[in-house]
């Protein structure tokens, strides 16, 4: 039976507890601002963790060389073969899947997979993050809601045929029937997943039909993983929370984009129970990260309540 954590109950404090040794495998997606990436990398670096960096094929040769040269000093950091990642295309999902597979095939043992962009930054130290994952070992963190019931305006993304052509999504599309006996789910791109969850996603034969269908959908990175985990025999615990602090603002007629944080957002970043925030740009505000660091090792409260998967649709009303 799948369970989903959605409510607030069973308070406990992270920051002063004995921890099981938790090793983290990070996948970091980089396409610009190499100095911002370096700042992120140094903030999350631990010798016992593992780091896989994907540099977008569209990134300049200079960025690729700068990032590659920087990582030479870190033996537990690797570079993934570049994918031409197109906004809205399945190529983003493919980069994530390739990253999971690469990390699973490494001759090392890790417990959790966390994906980040090069403009993310941690709100807590690795000590606090590892304590949190130790206390909640076995739980998977990913935003998930019933797409048709809670985000009906996005159904066109999966009920039409889309195709990547060159560096964009083709304007030509046509309607098609969605997958039979499958309930579509949606959430966000960012995840904190157990190793066993990654093994299921990359190795289980049930996932193949989802890969084939979602190859020609729009913004698949926000719904592919959710739909797979909610419509297969995967039996892990899913928590409707990606532990990311993001403020979404309008960007044109059809999409939102994450606000670039400034010092005016500091209270928002310091009062939540998030582990990471997106996004930052020192060219916009080069002081905000220094202020965040002052609370790196302060414990934070986290709340959880197990809800049976059958009650899922009744429990998300307060999130929309």
Language model segments and positions:
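ER/Golgi luminal nucleotide-sugar-dependent glycosyltransferases, focusing on the catalytic module
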Residues: 1-320
């Amino acid at each position: 039976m799948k369970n989903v954590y959605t409510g607030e109950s069973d308070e406990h404090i992270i920051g002063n507890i004995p921890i099981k040794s938790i090793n983290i495998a990070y996948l970091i997606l980089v396409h610009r601002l190499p100095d911002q990436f370096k700042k992120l990398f140094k903030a999350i670096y631990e010798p016992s963790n593992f780091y896989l960096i994907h540099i977008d094929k569209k990134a300049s040769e200079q960025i690729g060389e700068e990032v590659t040269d920087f990582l030479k000093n870190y033996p537990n950091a690797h570079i993934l073969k570049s994918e031409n990642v197109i906004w809205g295309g399945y190529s983003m999902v493919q980069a994530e899947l390739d990253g999971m597979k690469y990390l699973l095939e490494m001759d090392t043992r890790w417990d959790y997979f966390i994906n980040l962009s090069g403009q993310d930054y941690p709100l807590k130290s690795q000590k606090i993050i590892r304590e949190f994952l130790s206390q909640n070992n076995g739980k998977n963190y990913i935003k998930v809601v019933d797409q048709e019931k809670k985000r009906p305006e996005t159904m066109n993304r999966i009920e039409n045929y889309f195709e990547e052509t060159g560096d964009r999504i083709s304007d030509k599309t046509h309607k098609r029937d969605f997958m039979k006996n499958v309930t579509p789910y949606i959430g966000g791109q960012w995840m904190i997943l157990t190793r066993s969850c990654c093994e299921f996603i990359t190795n289980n034969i049930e996932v193949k039909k989802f890969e084939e269908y979602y190859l020609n959908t729009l913004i698949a990175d926000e719904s592919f993983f959710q739909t797979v985990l909610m419509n297969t025999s995967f039996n892990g615990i899913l928590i409707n929370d990606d532990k990311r602090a993001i403020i979404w603002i309008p960007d044109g007629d059809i999409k939102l984009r994450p606000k670039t944080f400034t010092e005016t957002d500091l209270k928002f970043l310091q009062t939540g129970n998030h582990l990471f925030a997106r996004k930052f740009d020192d060219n916009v505000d080069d002081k905000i990260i220094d202020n965040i660091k002052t609370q790196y090792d302060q414990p934070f409260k986290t709340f959880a309540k197990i809800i049976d998967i059958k009650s899922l649709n009744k429990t998300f009303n307060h999130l929309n």
